[in-house]
């Protein structure tokens, strides 16, 4: 309702239906989700294989060859690293950054280890090894800052401060739902739940599925591997970090300077920097409305880790004045 003002009841009903459709199946309306079985994704976010879905000017992704929008790039496959990330973050730095991860009160005690991180990181070409030393350090700081926010056990008066308590949690707290969305491409396994696990708290079958395929693990049938195998756990987070989800760039490309904002990005104040990474991860809830405590928590971790690694945070670290990547999508389809 906040996008357009309608006075006629019929217009309100049309908007309601469009909103329901816009988040239904694929494309920018569904966070970059892809259609199963080779079907086309229409401009309105539905999957199909007729001209209404695949025809020129009617298809936004997974389109037939020929004129039309470019399909979403494939998920990057982990490969040999072009350098050694241990030159950027040592074991002692890792322990200093995640100082209280092994506290007795932390659910993830003794799970997140330096060796597991290094093993996982070396499986992804370019992670922590792209660009000059400044860019490499910022990527490591940004990755651990965002994942520390997702797994934090800190509070304002915590020993050593709230930003020394990243990686305290391993599984989503409370009584989470199954996070199963009907999908022929990534079907949920009987009895399995796809709630948040690991450093990035990966959720939903449509994330566990492609992540597992990329790292060589059947996470649809065994999602808890993300919470029982530390290398797999770190790989799930790095996979998310390295993977673009249209219309969003990858976190990796943003922090390493490989992403160039479009005119629409610039108009939305989405400029290169740590703030865009927060926008990628949770911009729909946290960005675009001024100061937000969750955003400030992410920034607090980032500043601390940059200090430990000996690098400046760079520009545009907040997203309070940025529009989320999903804002305005309804207008673009009308």
Swiss-Prot record:
Disulfide bonds join 26-41, 35-47, 40-54, 59-63, 106-168, 180-188, 287-319. Transmembrane segments: none annotated. The active site is at residue 150. InterPro entries: Chitin-bd_1 (IPR001002), Chitin-binding_1_CS (IPR018371), Endochitinase-like_sf (IPR036861), Glyco_hydro_19 (IPR016283), Glyco_hydro_19_cat (IPR000726), Lysozyme-like_dom_sf (IPR023346). PROSITE patterns: CHIT_BIND_I_1, CHIT_BIND_I_2, CHITINASE_19_1, CHITINASE_19_2. CDD domains: chitinase_GH19, ChtBD1_GH19_hevein. One of its GO terms (biological process) is cell wall macromolecule catabolic process. The keyword Hydrolase applies. The keyword Signal applies. Residues 64-84 are annotated as: Disordered. The modification 4-hydroxyproline is found at residues 73-74, 76. Its EC number is 3.2.1.14. The 4-hydroxyproline residues are not glycosylated in this plant vacuolar protein. Residues 66-79 have a biased composition (Pro residues). It comes from the Eukaryota. Residues 1-23 form the signal peptide. GO terms for cellular component: vacuole. Gene3D superfamilies: 1.10.530.10, Endochitinase, domain 2, Endochitinase-like. SMART domains: ChtBD1. Belongs to the glycosyl hydrolase 19 family. Chitinase class I subfamily. This is Endochitinase 3.
């Amino acid at each position: 309702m906040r996008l357009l003002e309608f006075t006629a009841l019929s217009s309100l009903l049309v908007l309601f239906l469009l909103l329901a459709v816009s988040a239904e199946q694929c494309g920018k309306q569904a966070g970059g989700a892809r259609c199963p079985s080779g079907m086309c994704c229409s401009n309105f976010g539905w999957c199909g294989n007729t001209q209404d879905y695949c025809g020129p000017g009617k298809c936004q992704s997974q389109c037939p060859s020929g004129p039309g929008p470019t399909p979403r790039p494939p998920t990057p496959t982990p490969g040999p690293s072009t350098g050694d990330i241990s030159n950027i973050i040592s074991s002692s730095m890792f322990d200093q950054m995640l100082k209280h991860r092994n506290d007795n009160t932390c659910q993830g005690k003794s799970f997140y280890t330096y060796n597991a991180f290094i093993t996982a990181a070396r499986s992804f070409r370019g992670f922590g090894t792209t660009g000059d030393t400044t860019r490499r350090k910022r990527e490591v700081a940004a990755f651990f800052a965002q994942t520390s926010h997702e797994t934090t056990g800190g509070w304002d008066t915590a020993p050593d401060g709230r930003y020394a308590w990243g990686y305290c949690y391993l599984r989503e707290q409370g009584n989470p739902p199954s996070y199963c969305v009907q999908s022929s491409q990534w079907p949920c396994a009987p009895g399995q739940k796809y709630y948040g696990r690991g450093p990035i708290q990966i959720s939903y079958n449509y994330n566990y599925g492609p992540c597992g395929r990329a790292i060589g693990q059947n996470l649809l049938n065994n999602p808890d591997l993300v919470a029982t195998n530390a290398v797999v756990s770190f790989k799930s987070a790095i996979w998310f970090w390295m993977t673009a989800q249209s219309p969003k760039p990858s976190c990796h490309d943003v922090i390493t300077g490989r992403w160039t904002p479009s005119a629409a990005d610039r108009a939305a104040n989405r400029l290169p920097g740590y703030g865009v990474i927060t926008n990628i991860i949770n911009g729909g809830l946290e960005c675009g409305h001024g100061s937000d405590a969750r955003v400030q928590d992410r920034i607090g971790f980032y500043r601390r880790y940059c200090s430990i690694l000996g690098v400046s945070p760079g520009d545009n670290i907040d997203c309070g004045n940025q529009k989320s990547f999903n804002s305005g999508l309804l207008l673009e389809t009308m």
